[in-house]
């Protein structure tokens, strides 16, 4: 008996050792807010699988709570700026300025904001890379891989300084410029819409003209406006000339937070992997008070309303417009809202500082989801098959709702010009027209019918990079070409030169023949 127990203990120890043999060390450069909520799911799964995860952050993070006990390790630098200052400016910009502007103007305004805060971002980066004690500690730890959200610059620079292979995680960059220029992503403008334009893959002639012009605008304007700033900083930090695309382009894998249930078909590089909806999970039971309210809706069901974690307040006028529309529908409404109680609020509507959004969307009584179009919320709606009323505010939200609208699972309304009648009409359309629910369920079935779950796919590729010290076999040779080689400008120039030479020689031959013929005729006439 004793020998059997000893054998069992020995076997368990062996299994434990084998398991740890595959464990690695992961360094993380995250972005705050909803980006962090998505990345955190990956990190928690990496920890479950036995990996050691260290997160680089600053003292003024909004959602990255490094003080809370966690299996995650944190390396924190102090930032003196008030953490709410930039956030308040951004919320005002997104709610009151961007929605009323054309695409190109809204992008300029958005980038102006990032230009204003990039001094803070640069300071944060300097706090890490010029902290010799911290950098020495990170180098001695010998990390196997770095997981980076490129929305906040410097992660790729850290990876370069530490000589660690890295994986990027993102939805889209501004105008998709980083994916095209740095990731060498093919993007035929005839059917691939430029991100953040609200266009689809079915474009009219004028829309294709707009798509082409915006592509040029994004490429050259962002290069001049933002990339050069960081390239100077990167070059100084590395002690040699470099470009942002040179460092970002070294990413082994790009984890894109979408999937083909959402995306329009288009070409991608082999090191681009889709992990959209990795944070989604089956609905859990609601709190008792909330469940009672939901059940009181009867056959009419409920509507879930949330503008995300960033936009929990709107102006009093806008709140009354929204509340007035909600009061006129038969469904009960759960609205995530922290502002002053609207005077037009109906008895069918309850306000909450926070709601278990995923659990509500997965509830059988949920009929519709009013959303600003954030990627996390969109995917929770896809996961549970809930049709949407989209109220995009800024950034990729316009694109996200355009995708859902094109797939027949959403109705879009303009946040800036929205009236009670607009919102009421959209809600009635989504809740009474069965095609929206059917299309939402179709997308849900596509999402669930994957050979590998999104979270498992994300973790697999991170572990793959750890095991193989990179994924160079998936890296396109396009990264080694200059821009004129990439677009075959040199080949086109050579062929044009050949054609021009041939035309020149042909013309010369014709002229020579004509001159010869004329001379012969003159001689014959004289004779």
UniProtKB/Swiss-Prot annotation:
Pfam families: UDPGT (PF00201). The chain crosses the membrane at residues 487-507. Glycans are attached at residue 313. Residues 1-23 form the signal peptide. UDP-glucuronosyltransferases catalyze phase II biotransformation reactions in which lipophilic substrates are conjugated with glucuronic acid to increase water solubility and enhance excretion. They are of major importance in the conjugation and subsequent elimination of potentially toxic xenobiotics and endogenous compounds. InterPro entries: UDP-glycosyltransferase, UDP_glucos_trans, UDP_glycos_trans_CS. Residues 24-486 are extracellular. It is a single-pass type I membrane protein. The keyword Iron does not apply. One of its GO terms (molecular function) is glucuronosyltransferase activity. The keyword Signal applies. Keywords: Glycoprotein, Glycosyltransferase, Membrane, Signal, Transferase, Transmembrane, Transmembrane helix. Its EC number is 2.4.1.17. This is UDP-glucuronosyltransferase 2A3. Belongs to the UDP-glycosyltransferase family. It catalyses: glucuronate acceptor + UDP-alpha-D-glucuronate = acceptor beta-D-glucuronoside + UDP + H(+). Residues 508-523 are cytoplasmic. It is found in: Membrane. One of its GO terms (cellular component) is membrane.
């Amino acid at each position: 008996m004793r020998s059997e127990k000893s054998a069992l203990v020995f076997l368990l120890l062996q299994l434990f050792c084998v398991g740890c043999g595959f464990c690695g060390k992961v360094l993380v450069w995250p972005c705050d807010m909803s980006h962090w909520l998505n990345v955190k799911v990956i990190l928690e799964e990496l920890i479950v699988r036995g990996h050691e995860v260290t997160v680089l952050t600053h003292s003024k993070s909004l959602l990255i709570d490094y003080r809370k006990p966690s299996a995650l390790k944190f390396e924190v630098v102090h930032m003196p700026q008030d953490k709410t200052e930039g956030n308040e400016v951004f919320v005002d910009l997104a709610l009151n300025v961007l929605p009323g502007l054309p695409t190109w103007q809204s992008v300029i305004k958005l980038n102006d904001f990032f230009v204003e805060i990039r001094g803070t971002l640069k300071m944060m980066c300097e706090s890490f890379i010029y902290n010799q004690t911290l950098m020495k500690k990170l180098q001695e730890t010998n990390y196997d891989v770095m997981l980076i959200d490129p929305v906040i610059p410097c992660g790729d620079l850290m990876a370069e300084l530490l000589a660690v292979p890295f994986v990027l995680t993102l939805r889209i960059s501004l105008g998709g410029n980083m994916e095209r220029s740095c990731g060498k992503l093919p993007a035929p403008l005839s059917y691939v819409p430029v991100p953040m334009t609200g266009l689809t893959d079915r474009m009219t002639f004028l829309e294709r003209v707009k798509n082409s012009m915006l592509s040029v605008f994004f490429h050259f304007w962002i290069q001049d406006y933002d990339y050069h700033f960081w390239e100077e900083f990167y070059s100084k930090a590395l002690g040699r000339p470099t470009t942002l695309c040179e460092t970002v382009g070294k990413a082994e894998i790009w984890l894109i937070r979408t999937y083909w249930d959402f995306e329009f078909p288009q070409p991608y590089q082999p090191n681009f992997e889709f992990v959209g909806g990795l944070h989604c999970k089956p609905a859990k039971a609601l709190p008792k008070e909330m469940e009672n309210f939901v059940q009181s809706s009867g056959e009419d069901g409920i509507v879930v309303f949330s503008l995300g974690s960033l936009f929990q307040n709107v102006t009093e006028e806008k709140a009354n417009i929204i509340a007035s529309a909600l009061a006129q529908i038969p469904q009960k409404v759960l609205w995530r809202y922290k502002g002053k109680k609207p005077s037009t609020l109906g008895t069918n509507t309850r306000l909450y500082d926070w709601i278990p959004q995923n659990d509500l969307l997965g509830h059988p009584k949920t009929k519709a989801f009013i959303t600003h179009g954030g990627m996390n919320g969109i995917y929770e709606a896809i996961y549970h098959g809930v049709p949407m009323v989209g109220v995009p505010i800024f950034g990729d939200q316009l694109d996200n709702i355009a995708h859902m609208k094109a797939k027949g699972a959403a109705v879009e309304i303009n946040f800036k010009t929205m009236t009670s009648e607009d919102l009421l009409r959209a809600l009635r359309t989504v809740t009474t027209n069965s095609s929206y629910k059917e299309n939402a369920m179709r997308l849900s079935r596509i999402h669930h019918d994957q050979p590998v779950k999104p979270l498992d796919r994300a973790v697999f590729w991170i572990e793959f990079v750890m095991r193989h010290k990179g994924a160079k076999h998936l890296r396109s040779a396009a990264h080694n070409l200059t821009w004129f080689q990439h677009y075959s400008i040199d080949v086109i120039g050579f062929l044009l030169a050949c054609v021009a030479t041939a035309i020149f020689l042909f013309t010369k031959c014709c002229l020579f023949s004509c001159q010869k013929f004329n001379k012969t005729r003159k001689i014959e006439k004289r004779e």
